[in-house]
């Protein structure tokens, strides 16, 4: 059955703007009611309070949530708050516990490293895109990072570094889009997320960590299939 009347909520990755969903949105059929939540529109800074603030917006309707990277824990918290109103979840290369040892380092690095230069472009192309798609794929990421609230960005990095493992289960159906090469989210983090889900399936999609940007066509298909389950 086509659940076209159910709202699909997209929660962005670390940049927090939602700008990087542009290609993905082009691939999701217009019959779906899709809303992108930008973290710049949210006052809250901790994972749990971000979820509480977002939950207020959607508490009277049934929703389907797509959470990219950083947003995994917000999605998890939303499932706990909204319960049966969340009809399903797709995680895009996401995590609900600390994704890797590198995430601790990320929170103390100067934000100047996120400005585009030869080194930062190369690092993002390597770690975010697995050196595929041509070096120009990193440009929109840097553009969105320049637009985001830098103080909030720093706090989001800190949130990732200090993530404790949650213990409550997610009851709704969960689909996890796992990039073929994710250099930022370790397999143990994915396994832990899977263990917290009552109904979990994994979809392996060709690409790097920025999977919605490097393979929007397949990601959109997985999302639409999950919504229609």
How should these model regions be labeled?
Residues 181-185, 209-210:
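Acidic catalytic loop of the alpha/beta-hydrolase fold
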Residues 170, 176-178, 182:
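Short beta-strand/loop motif that positions the catalytic acidic residue
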Residues 80, 85-116:
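Flexible "cap/lid" loop of the alpha/beta hydrolase fold
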């Amino acid at each position: 059955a086509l659940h076209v009347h159910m709202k699909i909520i997209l929660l962005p990755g670390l940049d927090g703007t939602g700008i990087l969903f542009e290609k993905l949105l082009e691939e999701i059929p217009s019959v779906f009611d899709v809303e992108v939540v930008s973290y710049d529109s949210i006052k809250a800074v901790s994972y749990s309070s971000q979820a509480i603030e977002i939950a207020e917006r959607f508490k009277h309707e049934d929703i389907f949530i797509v959470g990219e990277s950083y947003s995994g824990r917000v999605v998890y918290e939303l499932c706990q708050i909204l319960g049966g109103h969340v009809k399903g979840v797709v995680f895009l290369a996401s995590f609900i516990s600390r994704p890797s040892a590198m995430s601790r380092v990320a929170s103390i690095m100067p934000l100047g490293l996120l400005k585009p230069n030869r080194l930062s472009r190369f690092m993002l192309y390597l770690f975010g895109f697995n050196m595929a798609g041509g070096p120009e794929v990193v440009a929109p990421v840097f553009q969105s990072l320049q637009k985001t609230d830098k103080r909030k960005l720093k706090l989001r990095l800190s949130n990732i570094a200090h993530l404790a493992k949650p213990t409550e289960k997610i009851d709704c159906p969960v689909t996890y889009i796992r990039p073929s090469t994710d250099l930022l989210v370790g397999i143990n983090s994915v396994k832990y997320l899977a263990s917290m889900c009552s109904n979990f399936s994994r979809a392996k999609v060709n690409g790097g960590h920025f999977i919605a940007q490097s393979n929007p066509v397949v990601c959109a298909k997985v999302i639409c299939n999950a919504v229609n389950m």
